[in-house]
């Protein structure tokens, strides 16, 4: 039972991340083969770290500038999804931080 819950959460996370990439990637149609390679949770990421990741996101050329993150308080517990994907045949890896409901991207960083 635990495995199916975990797989369900991972599948939900992949959908949220795919929607985020579709909206904010510089070339969303060039992104393909998105895979979650690690999925976990954390309670150690604070508002300051999230703020730095969000500010850094504007410098990543694979993404549009001025990303609009969902409104609302950021939960103490976050889910972490490390993904791999390709853009124009080049492989990349990013880490996404999702809220405790796995309904929105809170922040992300490149690896």
Predicted regions and their residues:
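Sec-dependent bacterial lipoprotein signal peptides
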Residues: 1-7
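Cystatin/cathelin-like cysteine-protease inhibitor module
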Residues: 7-111
């Amino acid at each position: 039972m635990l495995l199916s819950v975990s797989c369900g959460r991972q599948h939900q996370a992949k959908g949220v991340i795919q929607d985020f990439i579709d909206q904010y990637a510089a070339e969303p149609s060039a992104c393909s083969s998105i895979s979650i390679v690690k999925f976990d949770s954390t309670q150690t990421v604070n508002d300051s770290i999230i703020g730095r990741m969000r500010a850094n996101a504007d410098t990543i050329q694979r993404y549009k500038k001025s990303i609009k993150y969902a409104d609302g308080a950021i939960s103490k517990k976050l889910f972490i999804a490390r993904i791999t994907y390709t853009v124009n045949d080049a492989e990349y890896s990013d880490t996404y931080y999702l809220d405790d409901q796995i309904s929105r991207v809170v922040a992300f960083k490149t690896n």
